[in-house]
Design a protein with these regions (language model features):
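Short coil/turn connectors at secondary-structure junctions
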Residues: 1, 44, 68-71, 109-110, ...
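Short, hinge-like loop/turn segments at secondary-structure boundaries
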Residues: 64-66, 131
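Conserved beta-loop-beta/alpha segment of the NTase-like Rossmann-fold superfamily
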Residues: 77-153
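N-terminal glycine-rich phosphate-binding loop and ensuing alpha1 helix
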Residues: 1-63, 70-72, 77
């Protein structure tokens, strides 16, 4: 089962590539926590949707971490991936999450999950997502959103 990881954001508000920033005691990134939790839940292919603008930096920090555990693929989300007749010459921002998921469609062969590389998801979320996706047979359209109850914690 495939997990699409939306990681093409440039981090303009953050001031850098938030998805590659070490936060754990051994330099783990939010992305590391997510990928390892997804693998533990049963996902066996990770497709990173990245930008060509930082692909060398991204692959330098990510490549080799997960390939021994799962199938890892990299696809690009850039303005240049749009057909020329659809491009807006004044636009510099990416075209959103749906467009990013479409970039990974070559590697989707059944039910799949989608996460943002810069968000933290608890490990239970990946298990809930994987377990639900496992129940899907031949659905043309089915969706699940793993949500959290907001409370004072």
């Amino acid at each position: 089962m495939t997990l699409i990881v939306l990681a093409a954001t440039m981090g303009n508000k953050y001031g850098g590539l938030k998805q590659l920033e070490g936060i754990g005691p051994n330099g783990e990134t939010i992305l590391d926590f997510s990928v390892f939790d997804a693998i533990r839940a049963g996902f066996n292919r990770i497709v990173f949707v990245i930008s060509k603008h930082f692909d060398v930096e991204f692959k330098k920090l990510v490549s080799g971490k997960y390939e021994h555990l799962v199938d890892v693929r990299y696809v690009y989300q850039d303005i240049e991936t749009l057909p020329i007749e659809k491009r807006n010459s004044k636009r510099t921002a990416l075209y959103g999450s749906v467009r990013a998921v479409l970039m990974g469609r070559e590697w989707i062969d059944g039910p799949f999950g989608v996460i943002n590389a810069v968000n933290f998801y608890q490990k239970e979320s990946f298990q809930l997502l994987h377990d639900h996706l496992q129940t899907l047979k031949d659905a043309d359209f089915d969706a699940v959103n793993v949500c959290y109850r907001l409370a004072n914690v």
